[in-house]
Structure formats: structure tokens, C-alpha cells
Amino acid sequence: MSIFSTRYLVTPFSSFSPPKAFVSKACSLSTGQPLNYSPNISTNIISSSNGIINPIRRSGNYEPTMWNYEYIQSTHNHHVGEKYMKRFNELKAEMKKHLMMMLHEESQELEKLELIDNLQRLGVSYHFKDEIIQILRSIHDQSSSEATSANSLYYTALKFRILRQHGFYISQDILNDFKDEQGHFKQSLCKDTKGLLQLYEASFLSTKSETSTLLESANTFAMSHLKNYLNGGDEENNWMVKLVRHALEVPLHCMMLRVETRWYIDIYENIPNANPLLIELAKLDFNFVQAMHQQELRNLSRWWKKSMLAEKLPFARDRIVEAFQWITGMIFESQENEFCRIMLTKVTAMATVIDDIYDVYGTLDELEIFTHAIQRMEIKAMDELPHYMKLCYLALFNTSSEIAYQVLKEQGINIMPYLTKSWADLSKSYLQEARWYYSGYTPSLDEYMENAWISVGSLVMVVNAFFLVTNPITKEVLEYLFSNKYPDIIRWPATIIRLTDDLATSSNEMKRGDVPKSIQCYMKENGASEEEARKHINLMIKETWKMINTAQHDNSLFCEKFMGCAVNIARTGQTIYQHGDGHGIQNYKIQNRISKLFFEPITISMP
């Protein structure tokens, strides 16, 4: 149902006769006693022996969290400390000096671009933002004096990608030099693996406003020959094989930044002529950021335990670490963003629990009441709610109030109505899907997506992020953000998450009982096979990235920091769903990725 979704498990069997033990346990819900949860039972309204009508619930069969309270509290990174910080500051100063020297060198554009690319992929470019922008501006404003490099596919595609990533206009027409008289890419490029890889990565920076299909043909051409390269085998250049395979799985433009950093640190060490000081800088920075994240996770796990949501609502997923992963995907850097990450993780954890209330536990009547209460967002609305919903509702109210208090204190603006609207829109989308389920209705793909981009859950995360990272918050930008339709920079990233979620989880969810997803909607509407539907959804993802690229340039009212959060959540979603349901169900690849991000420091040898 959402980025936190698994399936609907509420099934209204009319002839089901439950065991007596299940009846007695369900009765506690109507009497207001603590919830005594019974797994693996279907929802049906029945009468107990005392005449009270009680809904029999069904479990999501969720596995316990992999990362419990005791484990999180025990985490510690031993590769941080005074001597590590001293070395890091030395390397950082040296890199700043090197970048400023490069700025004043008119030549060596390729070297400049390669260094900037490596700084980004190694996760340390945020330390050198000003220097990088100055260098790129100089490259953009003057033509290169390196004629041989300028004529290479590798250089041209790298330049195109790096400049576009940083908001500099550069026409795709510069790639026309690599086409023959028939308008096809030259066959002489087929063996230029480095150039093809850069061309492939550059092709994902296309926008919807570009009418030419040049970048699309570049993508097709590069992908085909990169696949041929992998099939041919290249035992001498194992690092290049890994780079190509990695890019074909998830392009760099669509990859969660922090995951890319951890992966690329290991790869970069094996690339010929790798800069050993840059490797050391990246490892030190990764460990410092990881230690900061560990401290935040310890604080969050204490909050989560004190909330008692996992204990009192055992049907819901206990996923505080996974929630934190979403947020570090949005904004990982700098201790000044700690409050933002803490609060957005709370928002994500709340959205997970609320999603499970709609997906797994609540009856349709209860969900109607719950939706109305969320639209009101006031304490007295709790009186209308079933007992098991009260704790969740109050936790939601407190979380929103904490964020609203901070913004009111700092900027004098009451944002509670805006936060309420985002939660109300989310709950209404959940309710719509519940109604579809109970009526057996399969919407068209367009109708499904109009609701599903909201029900995926990222809306509340991005709206809360806006208020936490934007200063000052102007009346103009508020009106734009909360107009009749949310801006594209919120809608399109949510669409990416919804579609990648559906691709990763749809088959299992439909087997276990759920509302139709985008795949099933397309299949029914077009009489298509599942394979054809999946191909269409992948095409939709590709086109949606063009919409995101366009929105990045069109939404000038928003600050750079917020724009980064909005785009990064799309990258995070695509990465989290790369190997399955990265939020709800963890296989080895997903567990290993989270462990490397938060719990396994990189070993560094210090004198």
C-alpha cells in the first residue's frame, strides 16, 4: 500500500467459524483492555458468548526486527577519535588547496571532471561544494583547450553528466559528434568501454522538455554494448567489470548516495592510478558520518522503546533502523541536520505503523473513524477511536507537534495545519485503497496511480522535510507547495517509489491477498501478461526520471537543500527496492547493506 506496505490481510469470509480461543482474545479490543494479539487469523465480525460483536484480526506475519534495542545501544565505531579527526582535517585542507590550484589552471579539464566525479561517488563532495561549483562554472563558461580529450566520448559524456548534475545547462547536441552520416552512433565506439559507460550514465540526465531522442538512442546503444562487454568477459580489468555490472543494475543518477559511497570506496582502491589520499579521506569521512548516525540511532531506539508502539501494537512492523535508512538516503551529511533526521525518522516510523493499521488490522468502519480523526488532528478526537488506535494517534500528534513547535520557535510560523493536511491526504489515500479492496474493485492504471503516488507514503516525509530544512519559509513558497496539487518535485519522486515498490513486492503480495498494484491494473486494462506489464512499469520509471530532472530546473522557489531531499528520496526508494522489499522483509543482500551503512566501520590503519 505504501513504501512501508506489504499487503492487505483483511479478508471478509462470510462462513468462517473461528476457534473459541481466538474469540476470547479478540474481545479485549472492545473492552478497552491492553491488546492481546492473536496471529494468523482472518478478519470477520462475529458474536462472542457475551453478545459483544468483536472483529477477528489477521496477522501480517512480520519477522521481528533484525536490529533490536540492545544491539543498537551497543554499537560503537572504534575508528573515530582525536587522531582520526586530526588526519581527516589535514587531508581535507590538502584537498581544498588542490581544488583551488586546479581552478586557476586553464587546462586539465578531464582531470578536474574525474576528480569531481570521484569526490561525489566517494561521498565527500559536500565538504568542497564552493570549490566544485567554481571549477564547473569555469568549465561551463569556456571551451576546453584539450582538443584530444574534447573529441573523446569518455570526456564529452563525463562533462555532460557532471555539468547537468550541478544545474549547468549543456545541450545534448554535443553528442552528435559521435554519430555517423546515417544518424547512428559510430560502430568504432563499440569497444570503448570507458566511454560507453559514461555515455550510459549521462543518458539518465535527459529531461521531458527535450524533443530529440538523442539521449534515448545513446542509452540503447551504450546498454547493448556494455552487456556485450560483460558477456565477453574481461579477466584483466575486474574493476571495470564491476563498474559496468553495477551501473546496469541501478544507474548512478538513480542510486542512493550513501549506498553508492560504501560500494565505491571498495572499488576505487582497485582502479589504476587511484589517489591514495582520496581513499583515506573517504574512509575517514565514512566512519565519522557512520558514528554520527549510530548516535542518532541510539537516540531513536530509546524513543521507539519508550513509545511502546511495537509492544502495544504487535501486528505492526518494528522497523526503526529501516526508517532511518530512508532518511539518511534523503540527507546523510552534517551534524547540523541531526534534528531533521531524528524527526523525519519518527515520521517514517509513524507512517509504517499507520500503514499497518490500514493494511492489516483495522476494519473498514474503524478506518473511516481513524481517517476522520487524522483530518482533525486534535487530542479530543482520540475519544472516538478504538482502544488500539489511541496510542498510535497520540504518538502521531506528539511527533507533529514537536516539529511544529521547533518551526514556530525559530521562524514564527504555525505549520500544524500544513502537517495535518499531508497526513490527512495520506490517510484518505489509504482509505481509498481499503474501499477498493472491500468492494473487489480494480482501478485503471491512471486511477490507481492518482491515488498510489500519495499512498506510497513519501508525501509526509517530504512535506515534513520541507519545514525542517527551509529557512526562511516564505508565504509564496507555502502557497505553491500547498496548492490544489502538490508540486511535481514531490509527486514524481513518490511515483518512482510507488512503481519500484510494486515491481519488488507485487507478486508475493498478490499471492497473500492485496489490492491490485500497478502491474495487475495494467494487465487487466490491456489484457497483458505480467512480463509485458513489468516492461511497461519499467518504462514508466524511466520516463518519470525525466520528469524529476525537469522539475529540478523548474521549481526555483524551493531551496537547494529541500530539492536535494526530494530527489534523494526517489534514489533511496529505487535502491531500497533493488533486491526486494527493503523496508519490510530482509534478505541477505538487504541486511548486509544496512549493516555496512550503520554498523560496520571501515578499518583504517593509523600510525
From Swiss-Prot:
Catalysis: reaction(s): (2E)-geranyl diphosphate = tricyclene + diphosphate; (2E)-geranyl diphosphate = (1S,4R)-camphene + diphosphate; (2E)-geranyl diphosphate = beta-myrcene + diphosphate; (2E)-geranyl diphosphate = (4S)-limonene + diphosphate
Binding of Mg(2+) 1, residues: D355, D359
GO cellular component: chloroplast
The enzyme's E.C. designation: 4.2.3.105, 4.2.3.117, 4.2.3.16, 4.2.3.15
Keyword Metal-binding: yes
Swiss-Prot/TrEMBL cofactor(s): Mg(2+); Mn(2+)
Stretches assigned to coiled coil: none
InterPro entries the UniProt entry points to: Isoprenoid_synthase_dom_sf (IPR008949), Terpene_cyclase-like_1_C (IPR034741), Terpene_cyclase_plant_C1 (IPR044814), Terpene_synth_N (IPR001906), Terpene_synth_N_sf (IPR036965), Terpene_synthase-like (IPR050148), Terpene_synthase_metal-bd (IPR005630), Terpenoid_cyclase/PrenylTrfase (IPR008930)
Keywords assigned: Chloroplast, Lyase, Magnesium, Metal-binding, Plastid, Transit peptide
Tissues in which the UniProt entry reports expression: Expressed in stem trichomes, green fruits and roots.
Pathway: Secondary metabolite biosynthesis; terpenoid biosynthesis
Binding-site residues, (2E)-geranyl diphosphate: R317, D355, D359, R498, D501
Induction, as annotated: Up-regulated by jasmonic acid treatment.
UniProt cofactor note: Binds 3 Mg(2+) or Mn(2+) ions per subunit.
Protease among keywords: no
UniProt function note: Monoterpene synthase that catalyzes the formation of camphene and tricyclene from geranyl diphosphate. Also produces lower amounts of limonene and beta-myrcene, and traces of several other monoterpenoids.
UniProt domain comment: The Asp-Asp-Xaa-Xaa-Asp/Glu (DDXXD/E) motif is important for the catalytic activity, presumably through binding to Mg(2+).
Protein name: (-)-camphene/tricyclene synthase, chloroplastic
